[in-house]
Design a protein with these regions (language model features):
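Glycine-centered loop/turn positions within well-structured domains
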Residues: 1, 11, 43-44, 51, ...
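Conserved beta-propeller blade signature
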Residues: 1, 34-37, 73-76, 120-123, ...
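Sequence-structural signature of mature extracellular/luminal beta-sheet repeat domains
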Residues: 1-6, 25, 29, 34-37, ...
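Hydrophobic alpha-helical segments, especially N-terminal targeting/anchoring helices
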Residues: 3-4, 29, 68, 77, ...
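Short loop/turn segments that connect beta-strands within beta-propeller blades
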Residues: 4-8, 47-51, 87-91, 133-137, ...
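Residue-level "micro-hotspots" composed of small/polar
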Residues: 17-23, 58-62, 93, 97-111, ...
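Residue-level detector of Asp-centered blade-edge/turn motifs that repeat once per structural unit
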Residues: 29-33, 68-72, 115-118, 156-159, ...
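Surface-exposed loop/turn positions within WD40 beta-propeller blades
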Residues: 32, 40-41, 71, 80, ...
Length: 325
């Protein structure tokens, strides 16, 4: 739709062969003043002389985003057909995912394209994030430890990547721990829409979800840096709670430092909790029974189970992170 802002008059444009109900996902004007439209049936170029859009017949995949890089290449993100590039000499080239080739596009389902603060081309895909290296003509995967690799949108602000996913929003700063935000942090929901991210002129970031828009100032997003203490809340022997004052436990758990069991009392369950009450659903734990576990066991659960323990002396260790990890 083209609207005259002075009069409010509107004009609807369709591409050749496009049904009236077809979706358009993106409009982009490149440096050559060409006007492109990304639609359900591919990419379309506006013909100013004929006042209509013409379909690019080279590909028909659903096209969701269009961006131009500093070299004058126009990139088209498709959902299923990978990336198409139109260079400054009007030569087309397709980039697709190749199995077992780490230098290829990480997924053919591309949700969003972003030109970085130094001119880099990033592609957020259904299987993670990658960067195009123009000097080599290859892609480099950017490994981000997130609950979902379905990255729907990407916004870069002051060197920090904010990525919407199918399981919340990820804050990624190279060299620092990844931080996850979800509905427990105030988001409308955890499911976000492809190519629905925006960095506004006032610095606010917008992400579109299946339940409306979420917006925030990045500098106001504070990280909880207080490591929470952890309390042992219960110990069970063969599935039954051990009570204070019993043969096994002289004092209450909050005051006890040891548990005395006979050699045949060898199946125990230990429950614990982080004393952090800001979004406690996001607390994470690591525990280890010295003499049994060689390494820390990381979990979202707050319970450790041990069966058939040999006779001996053991030390149970547990630690936790808060809602911001």
């Amino acid at each position: 739709i083209r609207m005259n802002m002075a009069t409010g008059a509107q004009q609807v444009f369709l591409t050749d062969g496009m049904a009236s109900g077809s979706n358009a996902y993106c409009i982009y004007r490149d440096r050559k003043k060409r006007l492109w439209a990304a639609s359900m049936d591919g990419a379309n170029l506006f013909d100013a002389g004929q006042q209509k859009f013409s379909k690019i017949k080279l590909f028909k995949s659903l096209t969701i985003d269009i961006k131009e890089d500093p070299q004058g290449n126009v990139w088209f993100a498709t959902q299923g057909g990978g990336l198409w590039r139109l260079d400054k000499n009007n030569v087309w080239k397709q980039y697709k995912h190749v199995e077992n080739d780490s230098t290829s596009l990480v997924s053919d389902l591309v949700n969003c394209l972003v030109i970085g603060e130094k001119g880099q081309l990033y592609a957020a895909t259904g299987d993670g994030l990658c960067e195009f290296l123009p000097s080599k003509g290859i892609f480099r995967r950017i490994s981000i430890d997130a609950p979902s690799q379905d990255f729907t949108s990407l916004v870069i602000s002051q060197g920090v990547m904010w990525i919407s996913t199918s399981k919340g929003i990820v804050k990624y700063t190279p060299g620092e721990p990844v931080q996850l935000f979800n509905k427990y942090d105030g988001l409308t929901c955890n499911q976000f829409i492809p190519n629905a991210g925006l960095l506004a002129s006032d610095g606010r970031i917008y992400f579109g979800s299946t339940r409306g828009f979420n917006c925030f100032y990045p500098y106001l997003v504070k990280i909880n840096q207080v490591a929470p203490p952890v309390a042992i809340t219960s110990v069970e022997l063969f599935g039954q709670p051990i009570e204070a004052g019993s043969d096994q436990l002289e004092k209450s758990l909050s005051h006890a430092s040891e548990l005395n069991l006979s050699h045949n009392e060898n199946t125990i369950n230990i429950s614990f909790a982080a004393l952090s009450y800001v979004s406690p659903e996001k607390n994470q734990y690591a525990y280890k029974l010295e003499g049994v576990d060689k390494d820390w066991i990381y979990t979202h659960e707050h319970r450790a189970n041990y069966t058939n323990l040999p006779a001996g002396t053991y030390t149970f260790l547990v630690k936790a992170t808060n809602n911001d990890g």
